Amino acid sequence: MDATAFHPSLWGDFFVKYKPPTAPKRGHMTQRAELLKEEVRKTLKAAANQIKNALDLIITLQRLGLDHHYENEISELLRFVYSSSDYDDKDLYVVSLRFYLLRKHGHCVSSDVFTSFKDEEGNFVVDDTKCLLSLYNAAYLRTHGEKVLDEAITFTRRQLEALLLDSLEPALADEVHLTLQTPLFRRLRILEAVNYIPIYGKEAGRNEAILELAKLNFNLAQLIYCEELKEITLWWKQLNVETNLSFIRDRIVECHFWMTGACCEPQYSLSRVIATKMTALITVLDDMMDTYSTTEEAMLLAEAIYRWEESAAELLPGYMKDFYLYLLKTIDSCGDELGPNRSFRTFYLKEMLKVFVRGSSQEIKWRNENYVPKTISEHLEHSGPTVGAFQVACSSFVGMGDNITKESFEWLLTYPELVKSLMNIARLLNDTASTKREQNAGHHVSTVQCYMLKHGTTMDEACDKIKELTEDSWKDMMELYLTPTEHPKLIAQTIVDFARTADYMYKETDGFTFSHTIKDMIAKLFVDPISLF
């Protein structure tokens, strides 16, 4: 058994008793928000006559976390924008924003529109900060072979970094910092709202109704998140982790933060709760099988999960037995929450867990045999499913509406290419963030070590290569996102959202394992309301 020690929970029982100070004002905030929604709806309809105004308004609503209130209006507007040529194709800001929004909404527009902004020597001609930001953000919706977008990223990054040395006005400087840290398309939508609301509040051309609605919308959502956290924390406490499972990562609040990053809308409350429980259970399985148990114990646990029956608990050592029975009980209770028409979906929760332990068993075998996969592709084939991204993304669909059909779940279990791109992004990001810690702890060979051993490189060189492969996987995802399927667009959108969460959690370090690195952001999302004044 590995003696790896993870730091204890940073939150404990905090959310069992906590209510944001806005809770007593909930009724008034809801009424005020409903009035403002209609006022903003009128503004959105009025913008339909001018493409630049429409694009500016749509991107503002998206960044403030308000777009889900106006899905039909925005879709209709963007269909008009897509079919219309009535815009200034010499304005790089407009061209970039049009490209960004249309691709983000699944319209396959050509990147050739950017070639006219290059001089005879092939260099971009841009001297405006807003244009640079717009081009940089648009370029990250690239697919394979779009050289002009690859060049745009290199050019604009260099220009934006230079601008930070100048004295930009505060709101613009904040924008440049945020953009260089993470391009707009890859940011978590709910965290973007938290970060952008104060920036938007500094803008001279802000719309006061939109700003007030954004603040109310966030504060109302925060109340829902805290109610979920109370329920989930009480569920988690029944495992008595501190006593019975002291060797695992106690990260229930971080699990919910992760799920909220991907499914932030209020109507997805059940989705967040189920996906959070699944993420926590997978974390326990991962730490048991990968870090703490003997090989024999890990294989017994895998066998029990394949059997999925209470009597299989008799196979297990004491520290696994109670967890296994609680796992079965939790999945059954998810069926009760889903109701008779959707309880069939718990079958897919079980199947996802079986996929996870099957992959974990393979990794244990590799570790015991000192086996190094011959290629990164071979590694990803087995290690992609064990990073957990597939399981948590699919479990989020379990709590969603009836538009996610049985056929959709069956399709997801075939590992469609879109799902593979998510697993690859998550695995590659995880490995670059945690490779030193895991290698020191005697884990199986990661994709980073696999590349080092096969190519004789240093760890830094291997990490650079893995980052290139991560970018390739993002391009794969974008191509697949733009490819129509018979399944609801919500599935593709949510899978992209989970890729964003992986990017956030593993950007600099393993933020899930070393959760003090994301504690301030968790507090911003769950603890601190946004002041209305």
Swiss-Prot record:
- Where, subcellularly, is it found? Cytoplasm
Q: Which residues bind Mg(2+) 1?
A: 286, 290
- State if Isomerase is listed as a keyword: no
- Catalysed reactions, as listed in the record: (2E,6E)-farnesyl diphosphate = (E)-beta-farnesene + diphosphate
Molecular function GO terms recorded: magnesium ion binding; terpene synthase activity
The UniProt record gives the binding positions of Mg(2+) 2 as: 286, 290
Q: Which Pfam families match?
A: Terpene_synth, Terpene_synth_C
Cofactors, names only:
Mg(2+); Co(2+); Mn(2+)
Q: What is its EC number?
A: 4.2.3.47
Which pathway does this polypeptide act in?
Secondary metabolite biosynthesis; terpenoid biosynthesis
Query: Where along the sequence does the record place the motif called DDXXD motif?
Result: 286-290
Which of this chain's residues are annotated to bind Mg(2+) 3?
430, 434, 438
Query: Where is the major localization of this protein?
Result: cytoplasm
Q: Which InterPro entries match?
A: Isoprenoid_synthase_dom_sf, Terpene_cyclase-like_1_C, Terpene_cyclase_plant_C1, Terpene_synth_N, Terpene_synth_N_sf, Terpene_synthase-like, Terpene_synthase_metal-bd, Terpenoid_cyclase/PrenylTrfase
What's in the keyword line of the UniProt record? Cytoplasm, Lyase, Magnesium, Manganese, Metal-binding, Plant defense
Instruction: Report the GO terms under cellular component.
Output: cytoplasm
- Report the record's Gene Ontology biological process terms: defense response; diterpenoid biosynthetic process
Q: Which family does it belong to?
A: Belongs to the terpene synthase family.
Q: What is known of its domains?
A: The Asp-Asp-Xaa-Xaa-Asp/Glu (DDXXD/E) motif is important for the catalytic activity, presumably through binding to Mg(2+).
Q: What does this protein do?
A: Sesquiterpene cyclase catalyzing the production of sixfold more beta-farnesene than alpha-bergamotene from farnesyl diphosphate. Involved in indirect defense by producing volatile signals attracting natural enemies of herbivores.
Q: What is this protein called?
A: (E)-beta-farnesene synthase
